[in-house]
Design a protein with these regions (language model features):
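N-terminal secretory signal peptides that target proteins for export/translocation
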Residues: 1-15
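Bacterial N-terminal signal peptides
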Residues: 20-29
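Bacterial Sec signal peptide processing site at the extreme N-terminus
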Residues: 32-48
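Short solvent-exposed coil/turn linkers within tandem alpha-helical repeat scaffolds
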Residues: 36-39, 68-80, 110-121, 125-197, ...
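Alpha-helical segment of the N-proximal tetratricopeptide repeat
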Residues: 43-67, 71
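"A position-specific structural signal for the A-helix of alpha-solenoid helical repeats
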Residues: 47, 84, 91, 98, ...
């Protein structure tokens, strides 16, 4: 038995002696492998923006994309940054408009003077912030459709947000009825509304639902049809313009300017559809164009 043990021991020792030089020879290879460098400049800023987008920190994503989107001359990341900004801003404009309108209804419905005053303040604050976002959306839409043209294909290169938005902001149901919600619920509504709206925007961009958007974005960079995206931009800017109508902030000048930019997006879509006709897109484009005309008549 002792001889058997010795033979086994010596065999293991020989294997260790053989393996040791091999393992040691690999160490320089591992040690000398260059670290993966993080992109700098516009590439680094865009990477930071997509990271923030994936974490549902949309305001930070807007901060990181601002200089890239406004670069002159444009760089390799400029159009990508503009697409990402358009999606975030479109969702946030819708969210803050929804918040403002809910507090407006709450102020009208409540019988409590204190609630009324608080809800009127929240109405004003949300409409004011939403209007700034609407102007930002109009700016990026103008950049993407300059001269009534848009790229035939655009790219959304970002992860799907890891924090999923709700299907509805339940806190606002009580608000609309004139009931009171505490500051914690107000803050949660202010978080949930943009998350919900941006998830809905992503579904709209892929012409499907949230699950389709999530699956397509997980598969890699999402290619977007130019005509489709121009129609999306036009509808988004027109929605932002409504914050300046008589029912909201009543600023006819800004309302007309945004309607003009929505019309520019519509013309960009029309130019592409002239080259490649598509009945479904043409139908949606006509609906957008008719809505722009109708809204301008009501200024």
């Amino acid at each position: 038995m002792k001889d058997s043990f010795r033979r086994s021991y010596h065999a293991r020792s020989r294997r260790r002696r053989v393996l040791a030089p091999i393992l040691l020879s690999l160490l320089p290879v591992v040690a000398c492998s260059p670290p993966v460098e993080r992109p700098k400049g516009a590439g680094g800023a865009y990477l930071d923006a997509t990271d923030m987008f994936g974490r549902a920190r949309y305001d930070r994503a807007l901060e990181f994309t601002e200089s890239v989107a406004n670069a002159s001359p444009p760089n390799a990341y400029t159009e990508h940054a503009r697409v990402l900004r358009a999606i975030i801003l479109s969702g946030e404009v819708s969210a803050y408009k929804q918040l403002g309108e809910a507090y407006s209804k709450g102020a009208e419905a409540t019988k409590n003077p204190s609630y009324k005053a608080q809800y009127e303040r929240l109405r004003h604050d949300n409409f004011q912030y939403g209007s700034k976002l609407a102007l930002g959306l109009a700016e990026v839409a103008q950049q993407l459709t300059q001269g009534g043209t848009i790229s035939k294909e655009l790219t959304l290169e970002a992860p799907y947000p890891s924090i999923e938005g709700p299907m509805t902001v339940t806190q606002l149901n009580r608000v609309r009825e004139g009931g009171w919600i505490e500051s914690g619920d107000q803050e949660q509504a202010a978080l949930d509304a943009p998350r919900m709206s941006i998830d809905d925007v992503l579904a709209d961009v892929v012409r499907g639902d949230r699950f389709k958007a999530q699956a397509r974005m997980k598969a890699g960079p999402l290619k977007l049809d130019g005509a489709d995206f121009a129609i999306f931009l036009g509808n988004g800017v027109l929605g932002g313009a409504s914050l300046f109508d008589q029912k909201h902030l009543h600023d006819p000048q800004k309302f007309r300017i945004l309607c003009g930019i929505a019309d520019q997006a519509a013309k960009a879509a029309a130019a592409l559809l002239k080259e490649n006709p598509d009945p479904d897109k043409e139908k949606r484009l006509k609906k957008l164009a008719d809505q722009i005309k109708a809204d301008l008549k009501n200024v």
